[in-house]
């Protein structure tokens, strides 16, 4: 019998309100025994705090992940490799792991770096989409982002 490898799920927790987490994201958290969460140098885990508001985390293994806040590519790469090394034993043990991400997991998310590294090693990954902050802000302001035949305009500022 072939040994089962765990799946790394990138789970979007949305813009801060647990009620804006998708059903798919919440269900993913409920089924994964391991929850990986980015942790600040000061020890805060904002994405985990949001996910706890949605419930379903009792009895889960919480795996804090530290990511370097640097523009140095070598420092970032080392940080991503350390996170992969922290997650890999759980996947090797067949434990599905949910990695929490603020906003949507497909927009500037740390999950993408781990996804790329782990997929290159043959590990399966999947994503649970979320509500991006710009959509939540429009809803909060009760303002549509587009109307009629308008095309949305998205600007990304790389260097401020």
Name every feature range the model reports, one short phrase each.
Residues 1-18, 23-124:
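Class I S-adenosyl-L-methionine
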Residues 114, 118, 134-141:
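Buried hydrophobic packing segments
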Residues 8, 152-153:
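A residue-level signal for beta-strand positions that form part of recognition/binding surfaces
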Residues 138-152:
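Anionic-ligand binding region
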Residues 42-44, 70, 132-136, 154:
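Short gly/pro/ser/thr-enriched loop/turn and capping motifs at secondary-structure boundaries
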Residues 124-133:
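A short glycine-rich beta-strand->turn/loop micro-motif centered on a GG-aromatic cluster
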Residues 105-107, 132-134, 142:
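Short, catalytically relevant binding-site loops at active-site mouths
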Residues 158-160:
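Conserved small/polar residues in nucleotide/adenosyl-binding loops
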